[in-house]
Amino acid sequence: MRALLPLLSVGRGWRVGAAARPPRRVMSLYRTEELGHPRSQDYRLFFKHVAGHYISPFHDIPLKADCKEEHDIPRKKARNDEYENLFNMVVEIPRWTNAKMEIATEEPLNPIKQDIKNGKLRYTPNIFPHKGYIWNYGALPQTWEDPHLRDKSTDCCGDNDPIDVCEIGSKVLSRGDVVHVKILGTLALIDQSETDWKIIAINVNDPEAEKFHDIDDVKKFKPGYLEATLNWFRLYKVPDGKPENKFAFNGEFKNKAFALDVINSAHERWKEMVMKKCDKGAISCVNVHICDSPFHCTMEEARSLVESVPTPSMNKESNVEEEVWHFLRN
């Protein structure tokens, strides 16, 4: 294992010999540390609690934004409807960017990394008129779409990932941000016969957030956005030679109440997974804050896990794909 000093002074720079990039504070409780270059296959973005210890963004950040952090699975508290609708979102991909970043579900502490396909870094294509992702894209922590459980609404099993979130606020967020969002609705994408829920939400700190309470408010105040969202998800794999994606409910966006049921169900499945009550497959459930989980580790063990990550090369790959535009016929 390498010493911590090289990890901080070498691994965080944009190039060899660069000054260390200090951990970036995220909201009030979380910050991030970069290991390697963002355009390299060994790039990792690790999460730390503001107290200084490493955590998993998948397992250690509470699902509910009003939840007190305890060394246990967070328990719900009675709140009014608006307050009950506040959730934490982990931002993986900022709006207008193309790099397919994601929580590494199979790696200890689940850092964010760029997806790799056929040995190359994966970029989402620009399909005219959209540049990259048209929302801030990320995930709800402490949720899991179980690949062994058939969804009663879609009749398809889950995609083995945390639930995805499309944040529609006006601000472009940063990779690794942890923001409080209001849930507005959901879209059920069927990807290779798997259910892949897309939650529509808005950052509570967005200037327009007070106007949005349910999916119909998106239609009212951001006309065309839901249609663009549906079209984006239908077409984004076409430039790779794949067919258009399909949707449950004929592509209908479901309302907030429906979305909350989807989230609650995925949270219950996550609880079973992190307590080793179901088959988790290759997913890493290593966590720091859930003391009664069989996968719990100490803060010192979490630090050792990060220190044991091989020193990354600072070589970056070409990102030509980000500049290519695709024009598709109707």
Curated annotation (Swiss-Prot):
N6-acetyllysine PTM positions read: K219, K256
The transit peptide spans: 1-27
- Write down the required cofactor(s): Mg(2+)
Task: Provide the reaction this enzyme catalyses.
Answer: diphosphate + H2O = 2 phosphate + H(+)
Subcellular location(s) per record: Mitochondrion
List every position bearing N6-succinyllysine: K211, K254
Binding residues annotated for Mg(2+) 1, in chain numbering = D159, D164, D196
Database matches in PROSITE patterns: PPASE (PS00387)
State any GO BP term from the record. Answer: phosphate-containing compound metabolic process
Q: How does it assemble?
A: Homodimer.
Task performed by this protein: Hydrolyzes inorganic pyrophosphate. This activity is essential for correct regulation of mitochondrial membrane potential, and mitochondrial organization and function.
Q: What is this protein called?
A: Inorganic pyrophosphatase 2, mitochondrial
Origin organism of this chain? Mus musculus (Mouse)
